Amino acid sequence: MTILNARNLSLEEVHRLFGFQKQYNDSFSNYLSLQPLTEAEQQELKQIQDDFDRYLTAGKVSEGQVKFLAVAPLLRLAGFYRYPIEIVLEENIADIEVEDEDIKIKGRFDILAISKAKHTKPQTYFWVLLIESKNSQIDISTGLPQLLTYAYKNLDNQKSVWGLTTNGRSYQFVYIEEGNPPIYYLLPELNLMERERSSHLLQVLKAICQL
């Protein structure tokens, strides 16, 4: 049996191994109810932008810094630190076996938000949002194969999963849906450093947190 690491898979390989089909959706409102931000939220968002921009100006922002300076503050502001949400960091996924090709895939996700108030199966919590982060100089699309691989395993437990791949500046949300074949929808790319799209980013995170 061939053992692969999800980090090394290409998007083409993920499509072939799991049968994923890619589609595009140009509106978050097809999935989420987006609410206006308060003045306090807008001010905190501006502070996150300013903090991250200082590091961007200095040069490359590492993956760890992206998580600490951008992702973590955004999740806190969106409500992900409050019950019933629980944040899980850098845990190994259960091995994924592709029997037709005699392949076993291993991997470790970056950040997973689960709901402690919802079970999909006994001892299995509902996945609210799966996040894959990269350093600021890497295109966000490079995180998509890992994201889809980790989400695919959980489609046995729930009908759909929200995913997000980010380099701190750009944010690509993905709506992943079970089916034969499974489908993932790419939503419009958002950007922390642009006023309108950063507000939209926080609105989306808040809406996902309420699922």
Describe the function of each predicted region.
Residues 2-3, 11-160, 176-211:
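A short, conserved, highly charged catalytic patch centered on acidic carboxylates
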Residues 165-167:
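Central hydrophobic cores of alpha-helical transmembrane segments
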Residues 171-175:
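Short active-site-adjacent structural elements
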